[in-house]
A protein has these predicted regions:
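A short, proline-enriched helix->beta-strand linker immediately N-terminal to the Walker B motif
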Residues: 87-91
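ABC ATPase NBD coupling module
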Residues: 1-10, 36, 158-162
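Hydrophobic anchor residue at the start of the ABC signature
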Residues: 30, 82, 93, 106, ...
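A short, surface-exposed alpha-helical micro-motif characterized by mixed small hydrophobic
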Residues: 135-137
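Short catalytic/signature loops enriched in Gly
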Residues: 59, 63, 154-196
Length: 196
């Protein structure tokens, strides 16, 4: 299992504040991911960790390597989480709401970084989000889940033509600045969605 988890598939968690160990400097945490799959190669682990900090566009990687999680910003923390996941050269990254704790400008930087890494390294990316507009602009294909089941698979560019009532309800509940509505529609859930 360890040969797949972390090595071939890595996961970027939602909020680095809760994912990083508060009593270990961030560089050592990145290096630890490398050492899990390459035991006994500590010097190489530190060099790889510094390289990954550069890959995720962290300025002054040697300085940041020594910092603790409380000493870094939210955007830096998310980049550090990405570096930790990239250090093992995975084939697939699962990103669970990786930008939900970030402000809009930092969110765009992190999304740009993820997109560049996917393109340059040929990675697969599963991007988990509740933000329909973000998914529409960032993803190629969308799997819509309801109660733990996939209810619709659709190209992101075709979301406006979704067929499943749950997907339609999610889209219709989004505020629209062009067409003001006094009340946003409420999604009417149906038991048949669990059996279809």
């Amino acid at each position: 299992m360890r040969g797949v988890r972390g090595k071939r598939i890595s996961m970027i968690m939602q909020d680095p504040k809760y994912s990083l160990n508060p009593v270990v400097c961030v560089g050592k945490q990145i290096a630890e991911a490398w050492l899990t799959h390459h035991p006994g190669r500590k010097d190489e682990a530190k060099a790889r960790a510094l390289e990954m900090l550069e890959v995720v566009r962290i300025r002054q990687p040697e300085r940041v390597y020594q910092l603790y999680p409380h000493e870094i910003s939210g955007g830096q923390g998310q980049r550090i989480m990405i570096a930790m996941m990239l250090i093992t050269d995975p084939e697939l990254i699962i990103a669970d709401e990786p930008t939900s704790a970030l402000d809009v400008s930092v969110r765009l930087q992190v999304l740009g970084l993820l997109d560049d890494l996917v393109q340059s390294r040929g990675l697969g990316l599963i991007f988990i989000s509740h933000d329909i507009n973000l998914v529409r602009s960032f993803c190629d294909r969308v799997l819509v889940m309801y109660a733990g089941r996939v209810v619709e698979s659709i190209a992101a560019k075709d979301l406006d033509h979704a067929r499943h009532p749950y997907t339609q309800g999610l889209i219709n509940s989004l505020p629209d600045m062009q067409h003001r509505r006094p009340i946003l529609p409420v999604l009417q859930r149906q038991a048949s969605w669990l059996t279809d």
